[in-house]
Design a protein with these regions (language model features):
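Active-site-adjacent helix-turn-beta-strand microarchitecture at beta-sheet edges
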Residues: 1-38, 82
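Short amphipathic alpha-helices and their capping/turn segments at secondary-structure boundaries
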Residues: 77-91
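His/Asp/Glu-enriched, well-ordered alpha-helical/loop segment
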Residues: 29-40, 47-69, 83, 94-167
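Divalent-metal coordination cores built from histidine and acidic residues
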Residues: 1-5, 89-95, 129-130
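Residues that cap or flank secondary-structure elements
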Residues: 20, 26, 72-73, 114-115
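Structural motif corresponding to alpha-helix initiation and N-cap regions
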Residues: 22, 78-79, 119-120
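Aromatic- and carboxylate-enriched substrate-binding clefts and catalytic-loop regions
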Residues: 67-78
Length: 167
């Protein structure tokens, strides 16, 4: 889900919706882990990422590395979320091809605003924190190949806010 902590830039009344309520998510994670499965959740927005991490941490009574839970997208992770991902051994499954929407005047800027757009897809920060990244296309028809240049060379057209790094 693209649930945000603050409203969307183009809709001040909207923060996104839960696809699965956070309480139910915790129950699903516990069931999957008890059965020996890796759990994967899609989380794009900062609030969604926090909810998934909460569920994973609540479930991590044993060895969090053993479960190898994963979050797909992880596009708007703040410093705290990146630290939590690393500490919990959560795999960040990211899609560099989505960076095409982070260009100036692109979809992200329209929906998130310039400041939040500059904080999306923080791959360098994730790697520096020790995260394991899995790169994939997330079902994009052109496959993963077009995303490779974005994964390697995607500095934004404008400077990022202090404390953030180019992907």
């Amino acid at each position: 889900t693209a649930r945000l902590a603050e409203p969307y830039a183009d809709d001040p009344e909207e923060t996104g919706q839960w696809v699965v309520d956070p309480e139910e998510l915790g129950e699903l994670v516990a069931e999957a882990t008890a059965a020996g499965y890796q759990f994967t959740a899609h989380a794009i927005g900062d609030e969604a990422i926090r909810a998934v991490l909460d569920a994973y941490e609540t479930d991590a009574a044993g060895d969090p590395e053993a479960s190898r839970h994963r979050i797909e997208h992880v596009e708007l992770a703040d410093d705290d979320a990146i630290d939590r991902l690393a500490e919990g051994g959560v795999v960040a499954s990211v899609q560099p091809n989505f960076l095409k929407w982070a260009r100036v005047d692109g979809l992200y800027e329209a929906r998130l605003g310039e400041e939040r757009t500059a904080r999306t897809n923080r791959y360098r920060d994730m790697l520096d924190a020790g995260l394991r990244l899995a790169l994939g296309p997330a079902g994009m028809p052109e496959g993963p190949v077009p995303g490779r240049p974005h994964a390697r060379n995607a500095p934004p057209a404008r400077p990022r806010p202090p404390g953030t790094a180019a992907p």
